[in-house]
Amino acid sequence: SRGLGDVYKRQMYNSARSCPSRANLLTGLYPHQTGLGHMDGSHPAWPKGYSGFRSNSDNVTIAEVLKDAGYFTAMSGKWHLGNKSNPILRGFQEYYGLLGGFNSFWNPAVYTRLPKDRTPRHYEEGTFYATNVITDYAIDFIDQAHQEKKPLFLYLAYNAPHFPLHAPKEVTDKYMSLYMQGWDKIRDARWKRIVDLKLMQGKPALSPRGVVPESLFEDETHPLPAWDSLTKDQQTDLARRMSIFAAMVDVMDANIGRVVDELKKNGELDNTFIMFMSDNGACAEWHEFGFDKQTGVEYHTHTGEELDQMGLPGTYHHYGTGWANVCCTPFTLYKHYAHEGGISTPCIISWGNHVKNKGGLNHQPAQFSDIMS
């Protein structure tokens, strides 16, 4: 994203899943204190900590605080804090994005513009891709704040690279030769780079190849298979899945560059505090080979024309535990778990000339609640 990153903070701890982390980030409270101790669903029999995101009668969001302080507050992207509230009711003046947790990146009908009296942007058929459009609105909001001469608080919450894995084919194709090397070689290469860059303190060691955890879809925990034990068709299918994931990150990175360029154009970049982080570790759902429909259980190996169509409109895929183990290098376990693989993700910080140690590495542990509090 064009040089963004004055400080790389290695230990920024989240709450292991989307909803709890977002509630934690926006309120500075532990997820249970906001009603999102698990996810965004609720049930009358559940205790208060699991009752769903509560109103501002007992918590306040960073957007509400900054709005009262005179900021222009806007959000573009994934809300995923349940249907008891929405961004406008919780302090954001402008919103565009996905109110739920995940959906198609190709279908504009599942995205929402709020307040309801706003006129949404128009996109010709076949040109909509969510990551690009979320950025279009983010840039609109940046420009609106600049025109109104107000300080800006923008919460830019991309749904990429969450499943379903969707990306432009030409970007996906760039990564196929890399990921055909397989998850064992790539995990080893990532570990070597971590060591060479001195990203870990002390004398760290790479954890063994991971496991597929017991779950609703797996009767018992079992080891991940070695890449070389898979058939060529399985390897090609899995490499395609990871290539789509990489393409989603690639497109997101380019769009962050667009945001940075807009701030620079408006003369606001050096005066803007930017944090980039993730709401959880890599997603291992639900077995080593991923899944192909929203049920989470259906999977088959794609070949031929079907392989080429992966990631395009009308498809639905996830990459599975094998690649999640790579994405969490060098840690153990994944999203859902309170192990490092689930809760420890990097944070990149930029703040123009206000940062003393530009390009530095910070090992001080922090947690999402620290941002609001």
Task: Give the ranges of each region predicted by the language model.
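Formylglycine-dependent sulfatase
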Residues: G5-S373
